[in-house]
């Protein structure tokens, strides 16, 4: 269930909250082929399946674990990107705070903790840095000790038992971790985004529409543009056909219209009022939001290059 924030958690989706949705499934279904392009109103522009040899389905084959999924372990995520994802309660991840909360010797999930359901997302032996993170983290990050569904393996002869398997990437594992074959994740962290539970290179990879431009990006652009307007200034912008005009200013209520839609679908609490009020703080928050929301999508790299500060998160 999404985090109980006494805001989004008290409202249904139609009321502006997330109490009746599964943010994890809602987010990953945009990318993993669960929805055909024509069924996905969030896609504003896509090349559909006309992606040639560089399709997203081909990319997913390279993301797959080598032994269990017949993939290549080719795409590693940086630690910086992994750390950017928020905690379930909306706090930023802090390694120093993690070390304080979990003293040495208590940082890996135990059998007893699994049986008690203390960390429902994690298996025994998994590092607790990956516990209690926001839904987009679990939809996007293939962390050490995560589970790959690979459900279509059940329809094969040789790999029918390789379903819902835990995968480790650490040194010394000669299957999906480090090995002398050259087929391993250099960073030790993989990418789960775009992967459907059925996907396996042993059987088939679902076709996936390319999210070239989607509504979430437009919402972020809108909030960013409003944030950069001078305080106290108002601008009249003509409509596309000149029939009317719109008065635009740095309006926090309007900025929220962009951010709150993204945060509630992601299952993460909204920003604080002080974060909306401070232009510089909001700019940094928005950059982080874009980094997370659009991870492994085309727009994010270009956007970060064009932002007016080099202080990238």
What are these regions (language model features)?
Residues 85:
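Structured C-terminal helix/loop/strand segments within mature extracytoplasmic catalytic/sensor domains
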Residues 1-75, 79, 91, 95-310:
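Acidic/polar-rich alpha-helix caps and helix-coil junctions
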């Amino acid at each position: 269930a999404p985090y109980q924030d006494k805001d989004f958690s008290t409202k249904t989706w139609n009321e502006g909250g997330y109490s009746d949705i599964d943010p994890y499934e809602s987010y990953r279904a945009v990318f993993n082929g669960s929805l055909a392009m024509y069924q996905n109103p969030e896609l504003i522009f896509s090349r559909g399946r006309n992606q040639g040899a560089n399709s997203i389905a081909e990319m997913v084959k390279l993301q797959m674990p080598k032994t269990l999924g017949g993939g290549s372990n080719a795409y590693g995520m940086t630690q910086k990107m992994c750390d950017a994802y928020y905690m379930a309660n909306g706090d930023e991840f802090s390694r120093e705070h993690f070390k304080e909360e979990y003293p040495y010797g208590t940082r890996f999930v135990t059998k007893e903790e699994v049986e008690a359901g203390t960390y429902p997302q994690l298996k025994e032996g998994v590092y607790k840095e990956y516990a209690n993170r926001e839904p987009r983290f679990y939809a996007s990050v293939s962390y050490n000790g995560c589970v790959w569904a690979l459900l279509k393996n059940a329809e094969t002869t040789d790999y029918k038992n390789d379903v819902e398997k835990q995968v480790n990437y650490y040194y010394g594992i000669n299957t999906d971790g480090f090995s002398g074959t050259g087929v391993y994740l250099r960073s030790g962290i993989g990418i789960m985004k775009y992967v459907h539970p059925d996907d396996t290179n042993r059987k088939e990879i679902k076709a996936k529409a390319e999210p070239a431009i989607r509504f979430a990006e437009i919402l972020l652009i809108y909030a960013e543009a409003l944030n950069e307007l001078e305080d106290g200034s108002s601008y009249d912008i003509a409509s596309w056909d000149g029939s009317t005009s719109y008065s635009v200013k740095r309006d926090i209520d309007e900025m929220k219209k962009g951010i709150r839609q993204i945060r509630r679908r992601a299952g993460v609490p909204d920003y604080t009022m002080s974060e909306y009020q401070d232009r510089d703080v909001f700019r940094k928050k928005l950059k982080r939001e874009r980094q997370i929301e659009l991870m492994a999508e085309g727009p994010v790299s270009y956007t970060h290059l064009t932002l007016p500060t080099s202080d990238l998160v």
